[in-house]
Amino acid sequence: MKNKFLAIILVIVVTSLLNAQDFSIARLKYSGGGDWYNDPSAEVNLLKFVQANTNIKVNAEYKFVDIASDEIFSYPFLFLTGHGNIVFSSDEAKRLRTYLESGGFLYIDDDYGLDKAVKREMKKVFPGNDFVEVPFSHKIFSIFYKFDNGIPKTHEHDKKTPQTFGIFLGNRLAVLYTFEANPSDGWADPEVHND
């Protein structure tokens, strides 16, 4: 169950790609003091799950890219997580906006304590766009596995209801943000969280 939600996201992103290369995810390295590097086994385990349960060919290696680098344009799927603060310079915000407007996808998982920074910094990226709650009727909750009640809670923090937010560019979900759910903790090696 922990991996299924992001498997849905991967299916959506990958099926929209025309490139025949193996699919991979890059962790987005950012400034500001948040631990962008936490749980490095998460993406590798998720990609292995996707490979074992779908027809998607993956490259299950841990990769990270600096937000200031043009290398972000080499990956259709960027992942941002951590605890604490995030800061985008104006150039980084512009680069991320160009990436997303060019068809890239960003998944943000609040591992705890990122909410204010995520909302503040994404306003630099898209000043005219707010995060909106993704309705349970959206295909992301049913394209591969069915989640009638939205994203499941993986890691308990504050006993709040898990929520899924998005920034849409036209009809396309370009940024997905999970809050109070923390599915990436469920992808990490079991010994990381002792569960």
Residue ranges and their predicted role:
Residues A20-Q21, D70-S74, L100-E101, G166-N171:
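Extracellular/periplasmic catalytic domains that process cell-envelope and extracellular macromolecules
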Residues N19-F77, T81-G84, N182-P183, D189-D195:
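Aromatic-Pro/Gly-enriched surface loop or interdomain linker
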Residues I56-V65, I108-D111, N129-F136:
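Surface-exposed patches in mature extracellular/periplasmic domains of secreted proteins
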Residues Q21-F23, G32-G33, S41-A42, D115-D195:
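An acidic, glycine-rich "communication" segment
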Residues F49-K57, T81, T98-S102, E121-N129:
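Structured segments of extracytoplasmic/periplasmic soluble domains
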Residues I25, F77-K116:
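Short alpha-beta junction capping motif
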Residues A60-I67, S89-R95, K159-Q163:
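Alpha-helical scaffolding within the catalytic cores
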Residues K4-T15:
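Sec-dependent N-terminal signal peptides
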